[in-house]
């Protein structure tokens, strides 16, 4: 599946491959220490957020995506 932004598609594929490899080879075998894909994910996330803003896609709550903040209780 392609990403929301064409410029992000290669980053998405790279992250997906990294995560799937880590999940299958480490996490499922009991090694949950660390995630080697964190930097890839952060770069991909920034790319997606930029694409969403450039395309003016209205997404409520985008400002807190990935910043460790919980969704406000009054949001649905």
From Swiss-Prot:
Disulfide pattern: 8-47, 18-37
GO terms, molecular function: p53 binding; phosphatidic acid transfer activity
Source organism superkingdom: Eukaryota
PROSITE patterns: CHCH (PS51808)
Pfam families: UPF0203
GO cellular component terms, semicolon-separated: mitochondrial intermembrane space; mitochondrion; nucleoplasm; protein-containing complex
Site annotation Important for interaction with PRELID3A: residues: 27, 41
Transmembrane feature ranges: none
Localization of this protein: Mitochondrion; Mitochondrion intermembrane space
Coiled coil feature spans: 1-52
Function: Involved in the modulation of the mitochondrial apoptotic pathway by ensuring the accumulation of cardiolipin (CL) in mitochondrial membranes. In vitro, the TRIAP1:PRELID1 complex mediates the transfer of phosphatidic acid (PA) between liposomes and probably functions as a PA transporter across the mitochondrion intermembrane space to provide PA for CL synthesis in the inner membrane.
Similarity section: Belongs to the TRIAP1/MDM35 family.
Name used for this protein in its record: TP53-regulated inhibitor of apoptosis 1
Organism name: Mus musculus (Mouse)
